[in-house]
UniProtKB/Swiss-Prot annotation:
SMART domains: ANK
Domain of life of the organism encoding this protein: Viruses
The protein's name in its UniProt record: Putative ankyrin repeat protein R840
Keywords carried by this UniProt record: ANK repeat, Repeat
Length: 526
């Protein structure tokens, strides 16, 4: 029965009977308690749901020291914070109520009106202005944020009340332009933004985000708007209609050695590239950077178009195929090879960096086309081990890479960089770590990492922890790896090796727990 009554009637009954605890028998109110476990603030929820009568009764219950509403979840917001939430939500009746209870509309540098302007609540803005809020605080932030968010009626109101639209380096028109609010831009110009002043920054911001109408309007307002940064930004972001418009108004499409076509190519904007070519841009400027950038970023259609227009894919020692390989763009790599690119230029750069970056498909393709995987002392394998690319490692080894190169350097690299899976694979290919004179355990202890799992694995398969004058415990101690130090000692490491190097370095680096442990095991700190 209780739930059939609207909250307003129910609260009036409670007021008449003066029995406030009955309020909690109505589910419209009582359901608020279900929010406690979700960490939603009760008062914020009341404001959000516009239950002003409930808010008033909560306050009445607080006044009467009611046990339930004295709990923390009813009391963790200040009056000013309640005001801010109301302004953000546009609950003008709540705003008035909290102000009547003592909330300060000018607190936190007039934060209330900033929230109302940001979220477009004009009635709240009007009320706050009528009650003395400072609309010009923080360099007229209120009008700036209203411009930024496109709230035109609020912008008009604030201007009519004296807001300075040119404050903060003309930020209002910049933000409006950046976000494409053409009508606000027009108002700002009509209200005092000097049409002979520098329009370039608002134009560039509008260009960047593709707001053609704003660009057209601003350019029409100033003969000084000739900054060629605008057309570069349009080309960079692929806004073809803006590129065409700016070109028609005299912007230099060939600025900075045809940078426009280079950046458009690099970002994959084919239609922009075609337009710029039709207007005379040189696709081969800066030693064919256009096709190189397109290849680097994997834009196959742009690469194909540029090649059809005469771009040289072999410029700068086949940089196009090298960069495409390095970044894993297999289709671009295949196309460039089909057009005569040399994959082996600069000491097989392509396969070395494809391996380093883990691009297995590219590596497999390059090898199928004759790339030398043994180049530079098995550099592809070493790079793959360094970065932890197990698939590439397996492929290279299966294709003839030498896991014993440079005194087992692949194993050292894997151990020293924490790549346990690669280390296990390399060992499985016929390496007996118990007989090789390589300090694998010591390498795993180096630097700030300390790869305990690798240390345990190596010891479990017979690696010598005492190699290189007990390098393992010396480094583990120096870098503060207490768990590794204990494990090594338990497995026979000499804590006094190299004239007590371990404890001296642990002490010097401030690893007191390691020092204490080593002392307990017989080390001497002199």
């Amino acid at each position: 029965m209780y739930d059939n009554l609207p909250p307003e009637i129910w609260t009036n009954i409670i007021s008449y009977t003066n029995e406030f605890n009955l309020l909690f028998t109505n589910s419209n109110f009582f359901s608020l308690f279900n929010l406690i476990n979700t960490k939603i603030n009760i008062i914020e929820h009341v404001i959000k749901r516009e239950h002003l009568s409930v808010q008033k009764y909560i306050d009445q219950l607080k006044k009467n020291c009611n046990e339930i509403v004295s709990k923390k979840f009813f009391n963790d917001l200040t009056l000013n914070e309640c005001l801010f939430i109301s302004c953000k939500r546009g609950r003008n009746d709540f705003v008035k109520y909290f102000v009547s209870k003592g909330a300060n509309i000018r607190s936190r540098d007039n934060f209330a009106i900033k929230l109302a302007c940001e979220h477009g609540h004009i009635e709240v803005v009007k009320y706050l202005i009528d009650n003395g809020v400072d609309i010009r605080s923080e360099k007229n932030y209120a009008v700036r944020i209203a411009c930024n968010n496109g709230h035109i009626d609020i912008v008009k109101l604030l201007i009519s009340k004296g807001a300075n639209i040119r404050d903060y380096d003309n930020c209002a028109i910049k933000w409006a332009s950046e976000n494409g609010h053409i009508e606000i831009v027009k108002i700002l110009v009509s209200q005092g933004y000097d049409s002979t002043s520098n329009f370039n920054e608002p134009v560039i911001l509008a260009v960047k985000n593709g707001h053609l109408e704003v660009v057209k309007y601003l350019v029409s307002q100033s003969d000084r708007c000739r900054n060629n940064s605008a057309i570069i930004s349009a080309a960079e972001n692929g806004h073809i209609e803006i590129v065409k418009f700016l070109a028609s108004r005299g912007s230099n499409i060939r600025i900075d050695d045809d940078y426009t076509i280079r950046i458009a190519s690099g970002n994959g904007h084919l239609e922009v590239v075609k337009f710029l070519v039709s207007k005379g841009c040189n696709i081969r400027s800066e030693i064919d950077h256009a096709v190189q950038w397109a290849s680097t970023n994997g834009h196959l259609e742009v690469v194909e178009y540029l090649v059809s227009q005469g771009a040289d894919i072999k410029s700068e020692y086949d940089r196009s195929v090298r960069c495409a390989s390095q970044n894993g763009h297999i289709e671009v790599v295949k196309y460039l090879v089909s057009q005569g690119a040399n994959i082996r230029n600069i000491n097989d750069y392509a396969v070395r960096y494809a391996s380093e970056n883990g691009h297995i498909e590219v590596v497999e393709y390059l090898v199928s086309q004759g790339a030398n995987i043994r180049v530079d002392n098995d550099s592809p394998l070493l790079r793959a081990c360094l970065k932890g690319h197990i698939k590439v490692v397996k492929f290279l080894v299966s294709s003839g890479a030498d896991i014993r190169v440079n005194n087992y350097q692949p194993l050292l690299i894997a151990a020293g960089n924490g790549h346990l899976e690669i280390l296990k694979y390399l060992v499985s290919q016929g390496v007996n770590v118990s007989i090789i004179n390589v300090p694998l355990v010591g390498i795993a202890c180096i630097d700030g990492y300390g790869y305990f799992e690798i240390v345990k694995y190596l010891v479990s398969i017979g690696a010598d922890i005492n190699l290189a004058d007990d390098m393992a415990i010396r480094l583990a101690s120096e870098y503060g790896h207490l768990d590794i130090v204990k494990y090594l000692v338990e497995n026979g490491a000499n804590v006094r090796a190299e004239n007590d190097y371990a404890i001296k370095q642990a002490h010097r680096k401030g690893h007191q727990e390691v020092v204490n442990y080593l002392l307990s095991k017989g080390a001497i700190l002199s």
